[in-house]
Amino acid sequence: AQPATPLLAYRWVDTDRALADQLALEDEGQAGTLSPGHAAVRFTNPTTGADVLPTMRTEMHRVRAGGATRVHREVGSSVFQVFDGSGTVTVGERTWQVARGDLFVVPSWQPFSAQASAAGALDLFRFSDAPIFEALHSHRVQVTV
């Protein structure tokens, strides 16, 4: 059997640069982020563009210091790890402080948002089961603008 991806290591230096470049494009007035102050990189198979794993999506998100993501909800569950930084996250009606090393879960169709502290960016590693719901043609995302 072939591995899901020929790339066995996704280097932080490359991920960090991609996130920083997206935010730099935003600073120059160009589109490059998911929303103001919120950049993301999806880890993919470089030969196919598909997710690294057939049933799991992996991403790294960066929220600029003092910035916040838009509130969104989607079909499928996600697990986040705070890779670096600190801030607050809101899942459903519950809000709490997070810092480096913390893990939190966002259940299916629960509203979610994250805000970075004023002291620095908030880097979040996310994995989700979105590819399963996409294959079933039942993946939905709702973003509050």
Indicate residue ranges for each PLM-predicted region:
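A short hydrophobic beta-strand segment most commonly corresponding to one strand
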Residues: 80, 119-140
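Short histidine-centered beta-strand/loop micro-motifs
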Residues: 52-53, 68-74, 115-116
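Eukaryotic modular interaction domains in large regulatory/scaffold proteins
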Residues: 39, 50, 57-60, 64-69, ...
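A short, N-terminal "cap"/entry segment at the start of jelly-roll beta-barrel domains
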Residues: 1-55, 59, 139-145
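Conserved hydrophobic/aromatic beta-strand scaffold that supports enzyme active sites
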Residues: 40-42, 58-62, 79, 95, ...
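Conserved metal-binding segment of the jelly-roll/cupin
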Residues: 91, 98-118, 124-130
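A short beta-strand-loop-beta hairpin characteristic of the jelly-roll/cupin
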Residues: 68, 73-100, 110, 138
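Exposed loop/turn and edge beta-strand positions of beta-sandwich/beta-sheet ligand-binding modules
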Residues: 54-57, 76, 108
